[in-house]
Amino acid sequence: MIELKHVTFGYNKKQMVLQDINITIPDGENVGILGESGCGKSTLASLVLGLFKPVKGEIYLSDNAVLTIFQHPLTSFNPDWTIETSLKEALYYYRGLTDNTAQDQLLLQHLSTFELNAQLLTKLPSEVSGGQLQRFNVMRSLLAQPRVLICDEITSNLDVIAEQNVINILKAQTITNLNHFIVISHDLSVLQRLVNRIIVLKDGMIVDDFAIEELFNVDRHPYTKELVQTFSY
């Protein structure tokens, strides 16, 4: 379970980025954080990860095995390491897996799942496409077997086919390894396919919180309706 109680945060004392955030996410629930750029979505993720401490309020996690997948994969990889080295580091550091044969078998299984060519393993991050690197980014996080995964705009560099492939993989992971994941996105179609609950942020405050089946409910907050209408166009 993840719980935020009256969380307020700002990068300086004069302006708060998040104000009085109250969220409870039980195990098994996948949540989408929806809102425009600058509303505080990524800051919220950083707080859950423990990268920052709230100015006020408390954050409780029942499981410390939390990882994130960021929007820009190039900054997440060591530029001097091959893709294979970066992936195997996750297996060693998070799972204590040192046997090369076992590591290779896991990599081959995941390459097939993510529809990626094994020849790409010898490449540096700068030598593969943005979409391929983002899929490797997701793969590396899943190889580490986190219990909670925070996904920050992870489909922004993917084409339609690769996007659906990643969505299917993440949904399958909730059945096997993940307790839940949090998806931060401005893309409503991604959230509709991935999560069962949406929290809407505006100007650092929660303005709406509902089950995905209630997205088009007449009782939705006016800002939520505005986002839905904008996406429809």
UniProtKB/Swiss-Prot annotation:
Gene Ontology molecular function: any one: ATP hydrolysis activity
EC top class named in words: translocase
Listed SUPFAM superfamilies: P-loop containing nucleoside triphosphate hydrolases
Subcellular location: Cell membrane
Quaternary assembly: The complex is composed of two ATP-binding proteins (NikD and NikE), two transmembrane proteins (NikB and NikC) and a solute-binding protein (NikA).
Family: Belongs to the ABC transporter superfamily.
Name of the protein in question: Nickel import system ATP-binding protein NikE
